[in-house]
Amino acid sequence: MKMEEMSLSGLDNSKLEAIAQEIYADLVEDSCLGFCFEVHRAVKCGYFFLDDTDPDSMKDFEIVDQPGLDIFGQVFNQWKSKECVCPNCSRSIAASRFAPHLEKCLGMGRNSSRIANRRIANSNNMNKSESDQEDNDDINDNDWSYGSEKKAKKRKSDKNPNSPRRSKSLKHKNGELSNSDPFKYSNSTGISYETLGPEELRSLLTTQCGVISEHTKKMCTRSLRCPQHTDEQRRTVRIYFLGPSAVLPEVESSLDNDGFDMTDSQALISRLQWDGSSDLSPSDSGSSKTSENQGWGLGTNSSESRKTKKKKSHLSLVGTASGLGSNKKKKPKPPAPPTPSIYDDIN
């Protein structure tokens, strides 16, 4: 006897019917659930009533095939600029300007990469300063951290002292030092006055211009005869840093036309006149010329040319001497009107 016959032989007819009914119910339930899920999906996806579609709604989605119109029936404008949405700032930008805008917005271009790196470095410095502030409460004291927040970024030439470009002769431009200074400034575009001490400021203002630029906020390192700035600006800088008792240092001049004395001019004129009196008079020159022509048989052109040259040189020397003497009598020019200064903003 088989095992199936042994298991079913001990069951009653009622139990067999119950088992058959349960199996039938499971099959019907599975088939109904599958059908319901298919109908639900077709309705949600929109393809359940494809065969019984309304003709009016079909006209709304009908493909248009006419010249000058696109498939939706709209007028096609080929000159209309296409717009793209920036993924970073969500702005609508023309397609022709999308690539450069994306470089600047994401910090991937030449200039924008430097700006982005600078922003990242500043944010890292701020985070580091905040963490240090939690450790030490006195880290932001003005006496100790005055210049720490405004440290300039080191140049590549400063990072590499063995660079061949550093051995080249430096041109004396505005903000550059041509000679070795007791205080060595690494910034070639000017000196930041905020990082200098009182002694450094005093020594700098006695030998250099020191006027603060309106754009870079740095001091000019040219000499005291800087043509870009006036004496009034230099005097204002010294009063601002050294107090009202500060005086603009005098500049030694290698050639001073105003120092010519009238006595020297008179002596020069008299000497030139004495030298001129040693020449022959016109009458004597005429007699000498005739005697020379008769005695030696020479022409008079050479003697006349020499005398005209002497007279011209004599007149030119007298004119220069009188011009030098008249420099003393010239009136000084009125001072230039005061220019608007930037120290009101600093104060």
Curated annotation (Swiss-Prot):
ZnF locations on chain (SGF11-type): 84-105
UniProt key word Transport: no
UniProt keyword terms in alphabetical order: Activator, Chromatin regulator, Metal-binding, Nucleus, Phosphoprotein, Transcription, Transcription regulation, Zinc, Zinc-finger
Protein location: Nucleus
Pfam families attached to this UniProt entry: SCA7, Sgf11
Recorded GO CC terms: DUBm complex; SAGA complex; transcription factor TFTC complex
GO MF annotations in UniProt: transcription coactivator activity; zinc ion binding
Compositionally biased intervals (Low complexity): 116-125, 275-288
Domain of life: Eukaryota
UniProt modified residues of type Phosphoserine: S129, S131, S278, S281, S326
Domain SCA7, first and last residues per copy: 196-263
Region annotation (Disordered) ranges: 116-184, 275-347
PROSITE patterns: SCA7 (PS51505)
GO BP field: chromatin organization; positive regulation of DNA-templated transcription; regulation of DNA repair; regulation of RNA splicing; regulation of transcription by RNA polymerase II
Record keyword Glycosyltransferase present: no
Composition skew (Acidic residues), residue ranges: 132-141
Comment text on domains: The long N-terminal helix forms part of the 'assembly lobe' of the SAGA deubiquitination module. The C-terminal SGF11-type zinc-finger domain together with the C-terminal catalytic domain of USP22 forms the 'catalytic lobe' of the SAGA deubiquitination module.
Summary of subunit composition and partner proteins: Component of some SAGA transcription coactivator-HAT complexes, at least composed of ATXN7, ATXN7L3, ENY2, GCN5L2, SUPT3H, TAF10, TRRAP and USP22. Within the SAGA complex, ENY2, ATXN7, ATXN7L3, and USP22 form an additional subcomplex of SAGA called the DUB module (deubiquitination module). Interacts directly with ENY2 and USP22.
HAMAP family per UniProt: Sgf11 (MF_03047)
Role this protein plays: Component of the transcription regulatory histone acetylation (HAT) complex SAGA, a multiprotein complex that activates transcription by remodeling chromatin and mediating histone acetylation and deubiquitination. Within the SAGA complex, participates in a subcomplex that specifically deubiquitinates both histones H2A and H2B. The SAGA complex is recruited to specific gene promoters by activators such as MYC, where it is required for transcription. Required for nuclear receptor-mediated transactivation. Within the complex, it is required to recruit USP22 and ENY2 into the SAGA complex.
Similarity comment: family membership: Belongs to the SGF11 family.
Designated name of the protein: Ataxin-7-like protein 3
Lineage: Eukaryota, Metazoa, Chordata, Craniata, Vertebrata
Gene name for this UniProt entry: Atxn7l3
